[in-house]
């Protein structure tokens, strides 16, 4: 388009605007202003969110790979002056990372698997079967989402003490196997919403083929609910991985990563200085604590990077966004 054509087009637009009502002209001006301002506003919001999310991670990485003397150097901000892996190695040795990681995975993966099975069966029952007290029981499920775990922790402790399972993995496995583990309420709700969205004709066809309720659940429902199973599995893994409150109540010697990081200062003092009561500068502790946090979150970050797509699809199909 040459200059003359552009000039003619602008003149036509001016003539057209002169013929427009004042209300329409005012609307066009507001729309033009909005179209100009909104991209800038959106960019600022996204930049702020990125800063809030990425700043702790970048700070963690920066501190984990520097010497503790760099923490007292005001000229060192982001890039370490003395790049080293000593903090990572010392923290891993102090945490007994190998045994702690194995213990954490044993509780995490096992409880997550048990909780998936138990909450899936419960959610399927609420979605497809009619029985007395169904609404009341589902209200209890909603209360499990709203009521904090601290409310039932003391009765649970008395029960487990009577059973003789305190300081064993059974204190985590038993609630998971009975659909009462960490955040079990939201998992039941996810499965219920997903199973309610599946067509009833699937079960009718299975019934005509001679399948009972349990076989229908195994053969028809589970294959169609794999996205929800993956979503609940990721939720369960993250919540069990980060839990220290429940573990701290029931464990005195079984160590998990979350428990170790919660008590990281005496652990570091005992391992590095042979004195659990030693006082070290809080700023110097940062390199070890950030190294411990980095080692703890790395598996979760890697899992999310590789499974993000499936996780998002599962959330959308479960109905939590609708």
Give names to the regions the model predicted.
Residues 1-33:
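Short, Lys/Arg-rich, polar N-terminal cytosolic tail immediately upstream
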Residues 31, 38-322:
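A structural signal for multi-pass alpha-helical bundles of membrane permease subunits
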